Amino acid sequence: MTAESGDQIPTVHVATSLPKRRVSSSVLIVPVVSTGDDEQSGERPGAVVASAEPFLSADAIAEIEAGLRALDATGASDQVHRLVVSSLPVSSVLTVGLGKPRYEWTPDAVRRAAGAAARALGTAKAVVTTLADLPGDGVCAAAVEGLILGSYRFSAFRSAKTAPKDAGLHKITVLTTTKDARKHCAHGAAVATAVATARDLVNTPPSHLYPAELARRAKVLGESVGLEVQVLDEKALQKAGYGGLVGVGQGSSRPPRLVRLTHRGSRLAKNPRRAKKVALVGKGVTFDTGGISIKPAASMHYMTSDMGGAAAVIATVALAAQLELPINVIATVPIAENMPSATAQRPGDVLTQYGGTTVEVLNTDAEGRLILADAIVRACEDNPDYLIETSTLTGAQTVALGARIPGVMGSDEFRDRVAAISQQVGENGWPMPLPDELKDDLKSTVADLANVSGQRFAGMLVAGVFLREFVADAVDWAHIDVAGPAYNTGSAWGYTPKGATGVPTRTMFAVLEDIAANG
């Protein structure tokens, strides 16, 4: 499962020993931990190899540790050093720090270390690593995820003048004695590839990824993994009454679309009648100028990421089909481009959402909630047990939680469940409240609701309260606001590159796995 414009995803292999012959352009990645950072002992900080036996000889380990001492390595988290060890059948050894020793390692500590190492590989074509043999549940899959995600790059639109001269990483060999290692590594590779698919979609510029094109790519990807696919064009949307989606898209020469992707996994369940049904909804604004309520020019180019929610949902439902989750998953993806023009909706317009609720559009830059409202009502018509939706909803999310922590809103119990799982997988969602009194701020003098409040504060929560009005009462619901986390405008870190991150693909898929296992 890959997007059409992405770079090559490396293949993953499992082995129990190093190759017997030297492999050119290859790197051995070895984790190291900190030692001697104790004020009472006065011992000088240093680094020692972790998880290398039985793959490396005592002499090779001693040579690596001698090199680390010469470099004053401390084994601090994400610290990398490159060494040449003549006795090993690789071009070089790359050590990556894990920090202080632990009896067990969390998957995200390993994932992040693997990502940091992958970003330091340079032109290496193949890597071998002992990271997957560290003690701890889930570290095998996490090591693979980190290596794939850390080596991710997007060069589809570079000419020969600036395109990478090398082919990139194409082979990962995991050294491990872990039981079921092949299964765990395959799972990690599939998850990482889905995240890369979401990244590719977000990184594709709006000149090349407009509503009809995103719908086409979703259809191609969906059909490749056996999903049922339905695409509604602008005429079908108008006829069916998708007023929010039509209203947001009417200012653009590129008309809106609605995509439905269905995975019927109940047939795979032990008891098909008891299999849960999950609805996914993701905001797909392929470019957001703000419309008539236009955004500042300085940072508008980042709005290529305003379809990050749609990208994550498309990748997630495709992954559910690929890995044959025994639950039903139905994704509803509203897609539009928000542009100012003579045909654009105006502040003060009233539109009728799918399902009949009328909304006064006080600010055309609060467009995501309008297309999501249509999609939520349509998704709830399928009577799902759970609804998970995600979007780059509000700039207020970054004010409240920063650029790396998604805000999770919704039904109290399910919201907390989603946030907890998000933290477990390293995407670090944080539960947020939806105070009932904020609904009063959405009163309109001419319609059922206004799309924004007149207050400066609690913008993320107000948007969540607006969306809650369209969720069926019987449905457990969570919204993941990834306005900041979906797109990294700063420097790369861990397994996260500059640009599209793929958040919250791993959260949503992990929630689906949890529902499949526990209901």
UniProtKB/Swiss-Prot annotation:
Q: Which UniProt keywords apply?
A: Aminopeptidase, Cytoplasm, Hydrolase, Manganese, Metal-binding, Protease
Q: Where in the cell is it found?
A: Cytoplasm
Q: So what does this thing catalyse?
A: Release of an N-terminal amino acid, Xaa-|-Yaa-, in which Xaa is preferably Leu, but may be other amino acids including Pro although not Arg or Lys, and Yaa may be Pro. Amino acid amides and methyl esters are also readily hydrolyzed, but rates on arylamides are exceedingly low; Release of an N-terminal amino acid, preferentially leucine, but not glutamic or aspartic acids
Q: Which GO terms describe its molecular function?
A: manganese ion binding; metalloaminopeptidase activity
Q: Which cofactor does it need?
A: Mn(2+)
What broad class of enzyme is this? hydrolase
Question: Mind telling me which CDD domains this protein's record contains?
Answer: Peptidase_M17 (cd00433)
SUPFAM superfamilies in alphabetical order: Macro domain-like (SSF52949), Zn-dependent exopeptidases (SSF53187)
Q: Does the keyword Membrane apply?
A: no
The EC number(s) given in the record are: 3.4.11.1, 3.4.11.10
The primary site where this protein sits is cytoplasm
InterPro entries in the cross-refs: Leucine_aapep/pepB, Macro_dom-like, Peptidase_M17_C, Peptidase_M17_leu_NH2_pept, Peptidase_M17_N
Copy out the cofactor comment: Binds 2 manganese ions per subunit.
- Binding residue positions for Mn(2+) 1: 288, 365, 367
Q: Write out the similarity annotation.
A: Belongs to the peptidase M17 family.
Q: What is this protein called?
A: Probable cytosol aminopeptidase
UniProt lineage: Bacteria, Bacillati, Actinomycetota, Actinomycetes, Mycobacteriales
Q: Which gene encodes it?
A: pepA
